[in-house]
Amino acid sequence: MGKRRKPRREEAGSALSKKQKKHLKEFGEQHPFYDAVSKKQETTQVVQLPESSEDESRSESEAESDPEPVNMYHKLLATLNTVSDEEEEESDDEEEEALEEAEEEDEAEEVGEESEAEDEDNEDESDGEGHGQMDELPVEAEKAGDNEEEERAGDPAAEEAGEFTDAKHESKFSLETNFMDEDNEDSKDESVPCPTVATEDPFVQHVGRELEEQDISKIGTNPKKASLKWPALGQLGVSSSLPQLQPLKVEKETDLQKLYLHKPLFSTWPKVNSPFLSVDKEQNFTPLQRELFSIMNSYRDLFFPARSPTAQGEEIRHVYCLHALNHVLKANAQVLNNNSQKRDQKPGLDEEDLRDQGLTRPKVLIVVPFRESALRIVQILISLMEVGGRKVDVSNKKRFKEEFGSEPEDRPPNLKRPEDYEAVFAGNIDDHFRIGVAILQKSMRLYSPFYSSDIIIASPVGLRTIIGSEGEKKRDFDFLSSIEVLILDQADLYLMQNWEHVLHLMAHLNLQPTDSHGVDFSRVRMWNLSNWAKYYRQTLLFSSLQEPQINSIFNKHCFNYCGQVAVRNMPVTGSISHVVVQLPHVFQRLEADSLLTVIDARFEFFTSKILPQYRDAIMSHTLIYIPSYFDYVRLRNYFKKEELNFTHICEYTNRSGVSRARQFFLKGERQFLLVTERFHFYKRYTLKGIRNLIFYELPTYPHFYSEVCNMMKAWHRGEEATWTCTVLYSKYDAQRLAAVVGAERAAQMLQSKKNVHLFVTGENG
């Protein structure tokens, strides 16, 4: 029997693309967005169960027995080399469901499921099939990869990782061996003044300022704070620790050259940005873009927590691409101009005036969640360099489109999801990638080795796998040592991926490199040599929501001497106003002494005060929404220990397991259904049969609150009067509470002596 199984595994493995095999090898599982499940999965599970090793079974049983401390889960989450809790959860779910089905009506249940499946189930299946093909490259792409094998020399680390990096055009894009093209008329105005020359150019002022020891000691201590209100951005919080900085104001200048845009940006930007502009008005920026660029161009840090994936996403992407490319073009022009001066050896030339570089070449790091985002960024950068319809020379463009693009047929035509879901998961949603981009005058090189790149575009997990962990032999983070502009776009999505990767990245930014990497130290700025790069780095942070974890990045990892600007608009109504079903919402406040104890306090409050009210059979069809996966595991273990009648779904549950759990819950065969927030984020299914709803914690995304509540209307049989909704919150959930009920109500609830508050929605409907 063993000899017959081996070809099956090989056949199953051959059906995976190279990317899927690589992802499976590195992480031990497919991405939670995908549902690549074999049609004969149940049979395969039963056959493989006896083959499970004793160690694996023992670890699974231990994971199921007692709730483990939360801090231990965080330690496991931060370690890539060990087996994750998610893998144990998935294998445990499959084992339990397979045994359950084997004892009962195995095939009959499957037939019943298919016959009773709703239209949405059909959509979900096609959804999984369509997205499962997204990562697969066409045959032409694989052939192209084979033809470019010769170009991989010069980057051993990338070769070992199986990545393609272009080393063929190294000399063409080298800053050390190129000079300003003086014969070209377009290049005469491209030189950037030396930092010692008096100029109002924000770039020159920023990188040219030499801080003193006393200035460094002041940064972050007792900053001066001020509040501003701008028409588009709203309420701003401005802070700065150093005096003698230019006051922050909205730039009203319409002449792009006077905004210190480098060639060719002041001629290409109006055309590239035209889709967002009104035809009847002569303008180069939308009101939002103008205010954002005013802050970016002042080189202050920026936190914008109102980035909608639907309305403003592309506007913001365009304006930060403009700023990033403007910074790179100016920096490179300064280096090339100084190369020419050094070559000509003009009399009176001071070597100190030629300090124009960092310890490594990468200047801009753009972190985005999916390949589709990287694709759009590169397309914008290319468009911004195309002058007068003349195509820019882009190396490896074909390969880039094949690896980062997607086909229209990859998306199922009958997929119906909310607008924000369609915007977030458009195109190629692979979240493991990194790519270097080198820019020199009128040419661009994609897949440039990191130490020959100006811009690095990557996902958090893509960076984590190259940064590595302490103790690993093959790890590299020197390329992050001289990052001058850091852009974290769609930061809220990293909470749904793995926030530990973001923290790991921030901890390795602007550290002194372990190797010289061939740098000419006579050209390195003094503040880079003094290990002060983090005080010059500008951080642009964009998110669709305010969350303590995101706020901590801005507050604890940003040290820009120019100061910080944070948009601080409070929600007025909250997402509860979008609940259309007639439903009483009972908000119960739990007490906790500190942020460290709130997790245990919530569990104790739920098991002792809330759950006993729902144990009665009359309180069936109870859905428990759990934002944290660790809380989900803890509750699941507790429910099993108490032998409660429940089923559960998380982001790692396979499609057949999800279908069974939904059917059990809909028919009332299981009293409770535990659901994680990440499952709802990645799938956005409508779960039918809900009569009682419990939010174990307020949702990360406020609109998820109204979405889950409105699921009740999908299955109503005249029982609306008995529906209930219970929400647990603490004083540490102030931001999430304000996003759900509104800022004014949230303040009243947190200050009130009462611990229970009632809201009723849909009274007129």
Swiss-Prot record:
**Which stretches does the entry tag as region Disordered?**
1-170
Ordered alphabetically, the record's keywords are: Developmental protein, Nucleus, Phosphoprotein
Instruction: Cite the residue spans of the region called Promotes p53/TP53 degradation.
Output: 1-198, 581-643
Looking at the UniProt record for this protein, which Gene Ontology cellular component terms does it annotate, in alphabetical order? Answer: nucleolus
> Looking at the record, which segments are called Represses p53/TP53 degradation?
644-705
Q: GO molecular function terms here?
A: U3 snoRNA binding
Q: Which residues form a coiled coil?
A: none
Subcellular location(s) of the protein:
Nucleus, Nucleolus
Compositionally biased region (Acidic residues):
84-127, 147-163
The processes (GO biological process) annotated in the record are:
embryonic organ development; protein catabolic process; protein destabilization; protein localization to nucleolus; rRNA processing
Spans of biased composition, class Basic and acidic residues? 128-146
**Post-translational modification, as annotated:** Phosphorylated. Phosphorylation is required to promote p53/TP53 degradation in the nucleolus which promotes cell cycle progression and liver development.
Q: Which residues are modified to Phosphoserine?
A: S52, S61, S65
- Primary location class: nucleus
Report the function annotation for this chain: Component of the ribosomal small subunit processome for the biogenesis of ribosomes, functions in pre-ribosomal RNA (pre-rRNA) processing. Essential for embryonic development in part through the regulation of p53 pathway. Controls the expansion growth of digestive organs and liver. Also involved in the sympathetic neuronal development. Mediates, with CAPN3, the proteasome-independent degradation of p53/TP53.
> What family, per the record?
Belongs to the UTP25 family.
| Subunit-structure text | Interacts with CAPN3; the interaction is required for CAPN3 translocation to the nucleolus.
Q: What is this protein called?
A: U3 small nucleolar RNA-associated protein 25 homolog
Originating species: Xenopus tropicalis
The taxonomic lineage of its organism, from the top, reads:
Eukaryota, Metazoa, Chordata, Craniata, Vertebrata
Name of encoding gene: utp25
